[in-house]
């Protein structure tokens, strides 16, 4: 049974002087991701799971200006697994008018439930988007090997790190009109590619997860590097796999 919080206890969940507290981290990371061009125009998002509590950035806001009091807090143990349009259980809802939970919520839950991830990041990286356009339209996944930055990526996003000569494979799914409608496609791709550390969304961006926020961030950075180098390799007719 999920713990019951008083209003005071719920409010205290987003106020801490600890810079490593999830509510503070989400704000800091969103600012850093904004500088990288990953969450501009209110796009993208991040969620951190700490024990049985999930911290969630709001949707449709200036990500570089998020404050801890804007963070939504949900119990991981929901009455039902979040799905498009489903009702959510909340521990804390921000008092500021106009704030809504992230549209990425059910997709973050895919990472939490299917990979037991501790954090999930969604970016609108231009490198991710361009890569999905440069690859053949019917390509089910992105594959690359013999790149040093592969060593910063983990099997399934949460397992052992890949080796230089191993092949990284990231599935690609088609975009939908509404973010939440990606939930089923993402889950299906995660089931088909259990070793994938992320999901690319054609003409949209990428979802990346990890055991911890540190691992999710590191892998998002490594993957973005690999997406960028892959775009340049394709444009210069250099094979993505092998050491030739």
UniProtKB/Swiss-Prot annotation:
Substrate binds at residue 104. GO terms for cellular component: cytoplasm. The keyword Zinc applies. It is found in: Cytoplasm. One of its GO terms (biological process) is L-methionine salvage from methylthioadenosine. Keywords: Amino-acid biosynthesis, Cytoplasm, Lyase, Metal-binding, Methionine biosynthesis, Zinc. Zn(2+) binds at residues 122, 124, 204. It catalyses: 5-(methylsulfanyl)-D-ribulose 1-phosphate = 5-methylsulfanyl-2,3-dioxopentyl phosphate + H2O. It is an enzyme of class 4 (lyase). Its main location: cytoplasm. It comes from the Eukaryota. It holds the Pfam family Aldolase_II. Its cofactor is Zn(2+). SUPFAM superfamilies: AraD/HMP-PK domain-like (SSF53639). Its EC number is 4.2.1.109. Pathway: Amino-acid biosynthesis; L-methionine biosynthesis via salvage pathway; L-methionine from S-methyl-5-thio-alpha-D-ribose 1-phosphate: step 2/6. Binds 1 zinc ion per subunit. GO terms for molecular function: methylthioribulose 1-phosphate dehydratase activity; zinc ion binding. The active site is at 148 (proton donor/acceptor). The keyword Zinc applies. Catalyzes the dehydration of methylthioribulose-1-phosphate (MTRu-1-P) into 2,3-diketo-5-methylthiopentyl-1-phosphate (DK-MTP-1-P). HAMAP family: Salvage_MtnB_euk. NCBIfam families: salvage_mtnB. Belongs to the aldolase class II family. MtnB subfamily. This is Methylthioribulose-1-phosphate dehydratase. It comes from Cryptococcus neoformans var. neoformans serotype D (strain JEC21 / ATCC MYA-565). The lineage of its organism: Eukaryota, Fungi, Dikarya, Basidiomycota, Agaricomycotina.
